């Protein structure tokens, strides 16, 4: 029986079963799974077959924010999958391969890039990456320029903007990331004393 015909938030066991049900691994494969997500929004699972070393990552969007339980549009998962596929066409050396997108379960099955470290954490720890400027500028040029009005037909550009817009996530970014660190009017930030003179 296919239990994946209606959206539900998956557990680690569900994620392992999912990879077998949809043929990512064989039914006989001995798998182990773990949740590896540490963010506020989505659930991320890693499924590994130790015998072969094959592994995949599943990223699932749920109807509610992981951190606060606030409702959030599931379409964000489709947008991310489609953006990653486009970026993979323009800059394949910098983007994990997308194996499958499931619009019912809102799951992206992708290449496991766990051997890489989290850049944000590494930079916060003061690590220096000698090739970072070259690599990030190559990625940005290769993915952003071809998607601008300078290159794309203006009708196609408008269609993409319409397909990729997510007002709820824009609101989160605009408020939590770009406004509230400086205007703490909702008192949702932890403002360290050294930064108080920067925050209204």
Across the structure, where does each feature detected by a protein language model lie?
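Conserved NTP-binding catalytic cores of kinases and kinase-like/nucleotidyltransferase enzymes
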Residues: 1-106
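Short, charged/polar, Gly/Pro-enriched secondary-structure boundary elements
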Residues: 54, 116-120
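Short, flexible active-site-adjacent loop segments at beta-strand->alpha-helix junctions, enriched
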Residues: 62, 113-114, 182
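Short, hydrophobic/amphipathic alpha-helical packing segments
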Residues: 80-84, 133-144
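Protein kinase-like catalytic domain
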Residues: 88, 144-148
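Short, well-ordered beta-to-alpha junction loops that form the rim of enzyme active sites
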Residues: 102-103, 112-113, 155-158
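Short pocket-lining segment of the protein kinase catalytic domain that shapes the ATP-binding cleft
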Residues: 108-116
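ATP-dependent phospho-/nucleotidyl transfer catalytic cores
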Residues: 120-138, 148-200
């Amino acid at each position: 029986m296919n239990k994946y015909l209606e959206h539900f938030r998956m557990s680690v066991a569900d994620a392992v079963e999912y990879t077998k049900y949809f043929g990512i691994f064989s039914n006989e494969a001995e798998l182990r799974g773990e949740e590896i997500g540490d963010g506020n929004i989505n659930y991320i699972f890693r499924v590994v077959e130790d015998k072969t070393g094959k592994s995949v990552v599943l990223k699932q969007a749920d109807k509610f924010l992981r951190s606060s339980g606030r409702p959030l549009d599931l379409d964000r998962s489709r947008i991310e999958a489609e953006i990653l596929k486009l970026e993979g066409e323009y800059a394949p050396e910098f983007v994990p391969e997308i194996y499958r997108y499931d619009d019912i379960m809102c799951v992206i099955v992708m290449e496991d890039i766990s051997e890489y470290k989290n850049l944000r954490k590494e930079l916060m720890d003061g690590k220096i990456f000698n090739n970072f400027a070259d690599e990030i500028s190559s990625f940005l040029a290769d993915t952003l320029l071809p998607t601008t009005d300078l290159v794309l037909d203006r009708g196609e550009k408008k269609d993409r903007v319409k397909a990729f817009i997510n007002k709820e996530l824009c609101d989160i970014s605009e408020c939590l990331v770009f406004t509230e660190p400086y205007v703490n009017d909702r008192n949702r930030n932890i403002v360290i004393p050294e930064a108080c003179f920067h925050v209204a």
